[in-house]
Amino acid sequence: ILGTAMLLTAVSFTGCGRSVKDSTSAKTEKTTKETKRDEKIEIKILSKYDQIKKLLSKYPKEMTAEDTSYQGIVVIEYDSFGKGSKKLWNQFLKNVKDHKDCAIVICQYTVEGDPILQYVSNVNGKFYYVEDSTRDAYGSEKYVQYTYDYYKIYKQDGHYTAILTMDNKLTFDEAQDVRSLKTAIQLLDVKQ
């Protein structure tokens, strides 16, 4: 009985088999995660591509939908807007319609769960677009950048599709094949 009592006492003092180093590192890891979450990155209105890339590089390599939403980023997950994202998107569109300079970051996830960030700013009526695929393990291009003159919204076949384009007369059918076009890029496609 005395041996059992001593064993229980020893285990309780050692943190159930964890060393002091393990306990300290677990506390440090938890604090670091909380601190990272508290570091909200301001989405600035930019038109220079090197500045946009620098801004996007500030976001962590691994981002959950919750982390992304906390950062004020529009989250598209499973063909739907994430929590609070539709409100952010609608505010961006309102600013564009009101001819106010504005910017937004959109995050969509690959099949493997890797985040792809899209930065869009509207400055003096032009759209500056940078896609950041640096977090995509299987991505071939790390950054893609374009400038566009127009945005188009299509509501058809149960989908809400937003694109940036150089062609203001682009039809819905043509917009479905934007990957092959050099004059447009799809920002988001969500189920209505």
Identify the function of each model-found stretch.
Residues 17-19:
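Bacterial signal peptide processing site
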Residues 23-192:
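Mature, Sec-exported extracytoplasmic domains of Gram-positive
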Residues 1-7:
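Sec-dependent N-terminal signal peptides
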Residues 12-15:
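C-terminal motif of bacterial Sec signal peptides marking the signal peptidase cleavage site
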